[in-house]
């Protein structure tokens, strides 16, 4: 039911209205142009609304109407391959209506209400259905079967169910109590979709990035943060995860970042093949674009919109990865709204509820047994952009308290052109112990001990570097000089990865394991040769050592690696004979 009031005060994106009989988080139409807004505070007869569009020119006395509904998204066939703004308006529809720049007060349906979809029922007349049950399927893309579910708050007995081509708003099923079900359902973005129970993550998210999979794995259904200063590679890392992670669905939220970065995704994804299915990556992707030049308040909506879309596909039993780039921009939007509301500021001006909002977002991730008995997951990966790369600032610190994987990007590494610029000494993963059994069974029995050994070597290298900077590497014992060479190989061959190289951009587990195994084999053989009296200068002259870095770029990886390993054995045999 619509209730009409009038605007009392305007302060940027925050509008105060009087005479509105509204409740918290009601959706409102503000001003003569009907700008979209949401009730965020009610004080006596004054209703405070955050507006998701530019409020220039809005003045006191203009009408303000509450719709009686919360901000909700449309869920159904047609979501995949779409690009939305923060409040689920399809950008291609807005382009047709208003041109290159989004006009004010423009509304657009999240799904195409005219497109026909082939619906195949999986229940029959007389079947009892409850919230979350699948009543039929639609083949949305070649690989994704879109399951049409009963809304979580509806249950009953099927009186009639249809089969054939329908739009998302056509009635496809009627229950005995008269409830009509469509392929589309609306769901409030701030309300988490219910599940039967949460489960413990047991499998890793395979990203194809060696430093992430090898040293700091994230579980499917886990949470991770990528903090880093400007230019250290947050967006490229996020895009790599979107491209190559082994989930069925990817939701990419560009929250307050540059528009060009979203344009990159739109150019690249249709051209790239999903390594699991061989289909274009765009077919499994939903983009929520809320770029830096779009209204500040809509950044908050974009994060919740993206998470609700991810939960919907999780409820079908799919594994979803959600990328939020960047949560810092969302926090800055909260800070701006909070200051407009004249709330007491917390640390660095951020609102006192910053940590609660971040926790609310990340807690919606996880592995779950859905209402229809399927097992689905959401892996949430948030980029954090601390000013000046200062990890002690509130957004980074509050995120660290919540997430279980921390991939710390380092400006010094990026300046040395070491990419991904993830600092292996500052980063960590709390899923390592949970995933060790999976790695032992599915990769190799010696994978976990080899990984730990590599980490110990890198740790020792950082301690030796202090001495090297003072007196040079020649002052070290030969054994330690050799250790520095092995760790250099680990860094340059294993940890460095070229995101723009057609072969090196994606590295499957088997390839990762064989590269690390080859480095360790060279290291062990070199140490043995040193102990048998061979000079380190002789060992470092070996050709196979210089050829090993090229192997990861070769299309015939197996053949190239075997050739280098054979040469390595030959050279060490020749050294031993001296």
From Swiss-Prot:
Keyword Ion transport on entry: yes
MF-aspect GO terms: ATP binding; proton-transporting ATP synthase activity, rotational mechanism; proton-transporting ATPase activity, rotational mechanism
Binding site for ATP: 228-235
E.C. no: 7.1.2.2
Predominant location category: membrane
Activity control: ATP hydrolysis stimulated by sulfite, ethanol, glycerol, magnesium and zinc ions, inhibited by diethylstilbestrol (DES) and less well by N,N-dicyclohexylcarbodiimide (DCCD).
Activity across pH: Optimum pH is 5.2 for ATP hydrolysis.
Catalytic reactions of this protein: ATP + H2O + 4 H(+)(in) = ADP + phosphate + 5 H(+)(out)
InterPro entries noted in UniProt: ATP-synt_VA_C, ATP-synth_a_Xtn, ATP_synth_asu-like_sf, ATP_synth_asu_arc, ATPase_a/bsu_AS, ATPase_F1/V1/A1_a/bsu_N, ATPase_F1/V1/A1_a/bsu_N_sf, ATPase_F1/V1/A1_a/bsu_nucl-bd
PANTHER family hit by this protein: H(+)-TRANSPORTING TWO-SECTOR ATPASE, V-TYPE PROTON ATPASE CATALYTIC SUBUNIT A
Family that this chain belongs to: Belongs to the ATPase alpha/beta chains family.
NCBIfam families the UniProt entry points to: ATP_syn_A_arch (TIGR01043), PRK04192.1 (NF003220)
The protein, known as: A-type ATP synthase subunit A
Organism: Methanosarcina mazei (strain ATCC BAA-159 / DSM 3647 / Goe1 / Go1 / JCM 11833 / OCM 88)
Lineage per the UniProt record: Archaea, Methanobacteriati, Methanobacteriota, Stenosarchaea group, Methanomicrobia
Gene that encodes the chain: atpA
